[in-house]
């Protein structure tokens, strides 16, 4: 038995390893095939040729179902020394006029989530030319040319010493979702969905109880 899993190549998603570890313990004959995926582009399925996806704010269209397994505050990512970085937290309004990242061929619907277009009521000012990938994005932020946003849990895993994260006191939540095809009756996929649902419920209960490590 084999299960192919797409995941965001540009986020530090190792925190979800225990979920798949338990799946393998419950399904000892199962092997996992991993598909790192780049930033979403127009016309590309979030899953590609994978059977399931573990994705941050996926663009789930017709023929796909999803389950939210985590919800995290959004934070702003900026260069060390940026005037706003002296604060422990800022408001969304503080960054709406900043220049944001742009990525080559990025699906504008996904980009609008991270540039907070719904709060601004208009598209953001974007860096030009667009960057090619996650490493180039971090270099652009570290240079002071742009700012970005990310889930709070991802901020400590950004591999560049020239960037810092600042909490957004009124920022949106960012969802991590398990995604699968609606017509997929593979029992392994269904087992993963059930396990992920139980995992998400347990994490929420622990967070509500204030237990350490539940976030």
Predicted regions, residues:
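Short alpha-helix C-terminal cap/hinge motif
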Residues: 1-36, 44, 116-119
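Hydrophobic hinge/microswitch elements
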Residues: 38-43, 104-164
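Short helix-loop hinge/linker segments at domain boundaries
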Residues: 1-6, 62-65, 86-89, 118, ...
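Flexible hinge/capping segments at coil-to-helix
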Residues: 66-74, 78-100
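A late-sequence structural motif
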Residues: 14-18, 166-208, 212
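Beta-alpha-beta core module
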Residues: 29-30, 61-67, 72, 139-184
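Secondary-structure junction motif
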Residues: 16, 85-88, 97-122, 186, ...
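Short beta-strand-centered segments that line the small-molecule binding cleft or hinge
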Residues: 18-22, 26, 40-78, 142, ...
């Amino acid at each position: 038995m084999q299960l192919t899993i797409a995941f965001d190549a540009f986020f530090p998603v190792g925190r979800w390893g225990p979920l798949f570890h338990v799946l393998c313990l419950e399904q000892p004959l199962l092997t996992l095939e991993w598909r790192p995926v780049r930033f979403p582009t127009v016309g590309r399925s979030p899953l590609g040729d994978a059977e399931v996806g573990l994705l941050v704010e996926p663009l789930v269209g017709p023929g796909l179902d999803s389950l939210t397994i985590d919800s995290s505050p959004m934070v702003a990512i900026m260069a060390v020394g940026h005037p706003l970085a002296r604060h422990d937290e800022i408001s969304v309004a503080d960054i709406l006029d900043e220049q944001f990242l742009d990525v080559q061929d990025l699906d504008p619907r996904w980009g609008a989530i991270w540039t907070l277009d719904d709060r601004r009521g208009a598209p953001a000012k974007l860096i030009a030319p667009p960057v090619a990938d996650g490493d180039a994005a971090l270099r652009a932020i570290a240079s002071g040319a742009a700012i970005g946003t990310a889930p709070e849990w991802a901020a400590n895993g950004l591999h560049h010493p020239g960037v810092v994260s600042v909490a957004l006191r009124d920022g949106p939540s960012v969802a991590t979702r398990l995604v699968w095809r609606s017509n997929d009756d593979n029992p392994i996929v269904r087992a993963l969905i059930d396990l992920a649902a139980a995992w998400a419920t347990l994490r929420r209960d622990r967070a509500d109880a204030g237990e350490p490590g539940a976030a």
